[in-house]
Amino acid sequence: MRHYEIVFMVHPDQSEQVPAMIERYTASVTEAGGQVHRLEDWGRRQLAYPINKLHKAHYVLMNVEAPKSVIDELETNFRYNDAVLRNLIVHTKAAVKEASLMAKAKESKTTEVVAEVESKEASE
C-alpha cells in the first residue's frame, strides 16, 4: 500500500459537519485495510485569496496508508461534496507520524498562554 498526505478545506458554514466527514473518510480507509497515521483538524483559517467569495475555511490534514482504489474513492467524494472547497492528495514515500508545523505552532502557542496565565496567577 502507498502513503498519502491529504488536505481538504471545508466551507466555514459547514464546520459542524467536519467530525462526521473525518469519521466517514477514516472509516473508508480502515475498512479497505488501510491505516491513518496522522489526523489533524486545523480548524478555521484565513485563506490566502478568496474562494467562492469566502475568506476562511476549515482545514483538515490526514496522512494515510491505503490502496489506490480508496484514494480514488476519497477523491470522488471530495469532488461531489459541495462542502469541500478544495483538496490536495499527495503521494509520499513513507508514513509521516510526527506532528505537522501547524500543530506544533498551535501547541507552542497554547503552552505560552498557559504559562502566561500561571505567572499572572502566581503574582497575584
From Swiss-Prot:
GO terms for molecular function: small ribosomal subunit rRNA binding; structural constituent of ribosome. Pfam families: Ribosomal_S6. InterPro entries: Ribosomal_bS6, Ribosomal_bS6_CS, Ribosomal_bS6_sf, Ribosomal_S6_plastid/chlpt, Transl_elong_EF1B/ribsomal_bS6. Coiled coil: none annotated. SUPFAM superfamilies: Ribosomal protein S6 (SSF54995). One of its GO terms (cellular component) is cytosolic small ribosomal subunit. Belongs to the bacterial ribosomal protein bS6 family. This is Small ribosomal subunit protein bS6.
